[in-house]
C-alpha cells in the first residue's frame, strides 16, 4: 500500500484496549495526511519548542451514532490543539465525502481552521461534506471504535477515559507482516477470528451476499466451539453472537433463494442460538445472562422445521433461564413441553421434579401464612 499507515494504541480507563490502524489518503490530501502522520510520530515542535504529538491525549467527545473526536493535546476539551504548520491551516480540498462510517476527518471551528483535532465517523455524515476534510479511514480493529462509541458519556465526554497511549506509523515491511498475519488467520492456520465485530464495518467480506455471510458465520462457530471446549465460555458466547450478527444481515432470505441455502442458514442459526444460550448458562448467574438465554432460546423456537429434539433442547435451556429468574411457573410450562418432545430425558425430568417441588413448597408456605392470618 503506497499510502501512509498510522496507528493509535488505545487505553480505556487505563487498561490496554487495542490498536486502531489507519490508512491516510496521501494521494488525495497530502498536506492534511502529513499533519496527522507527524502528530502520530511526534517528531515536530512548535515555535516555542513544545512537542506536537497525539500520544497521551484523549478522545474528549463521543456521540453515539455520529462520531468520536480527539486530537486536542494542549487542552483536552476541544478548544485546543495545534498543527505542524502553525496553529491552524487551510482546508486542502473537499474531494472525499463523508459517505460511510470509519472515516478520519478534520475537526474545525469554521473554514481554514484545521489544527490537530480530528474525528472518526461511526455512520455516514453527508451534512459535513464541503465543511470538513476527509483524510483517512480506519482499516483494522473497527470493533474498538464501536466499543468506544458505546461507552456512556456525560456532556458527550466518555465516562471512562479513552487515551491514545502511543501512536506512530508502520513501515511497509511492518504493514506487510501485519497483512501476512491476517491472511494466515483467514486461512485457518491458527483458528483465529479476523473479522470485525459488526458486519457493516467489515470490508473484507460482502455480508450483503448471503453466501459470504454464511461462510464467515460458519468459521466463527468453529472458533466459538473451540473456545467452549477449552472452557472459555464468555469468549465462546462472544463468537457465537458475532456469528449470529453476520447471519442476521439476512433475517429472511429472498423468495428465489436456493432451498439448500435456506436450509444452510437455518441449520447454522439454530445451533448458534442454542450454543450461545448454553454458554450464557455457564457464566455466573445474573439478570442479564438469564434474560439473554430467554431471548436466544425464544428466537430458536421461532425457526421453521424444528425437530422434536431441537425444540426440546431449546425449551429445556429456556426453562433453566426461567429458574434463574425465579419464574418457576414459566419454567414448569417449558419443561413439560420439552418432555413431550424428548420423553424420558433425564435432565428434563430432574429439573421438572425440582421445579414442581419448589412450587409445592411455596404453595404450602403461603397456605400456612394465610392460616395464621385468618386462623
From Swiss-Prot:
UniProt keywords (A-Z) are: Cytoplasm, Isomerase, Repeat, Rotamase, TPR repeat
Q: What is this protein called?
A: Peptidyl-prolyl cis-trans isomerase D
Protein family according to the UniProt entry: Belongs to the cyclophilin-type PPIase family. PPIase D subfamily.
Under the heading InterPro entries, the entry gives: Cyclophilin-like_dom_sf (IPR029000), Cyclophilin-type_PPIase_dom (IPR002130), TPR-like_helical_dom_sf (IPR011990)
Q: Name one GO biological process term.
A: protein folding
Name the SUPFAM superfamilies for this protein: Cyclophilin-like (SSF50891), TPR-like (SSF48452)
Q: Does the keyword Cytoplasm apply?
A: yes
Q: Name one GO molecular function term.
A: cyclosporin A binding
Provide the function of this protein.
PPIases accelerate the folding of proteins. It catalyzes the cis-trans isomerization of proline imidic peptide bonds in oligopeptides.
Q: Which GO terms describe its cellular component?
A: cytoplasm; intracellular membrane-bounded organelle
**Cellular compartment(s):** Cytoplasm
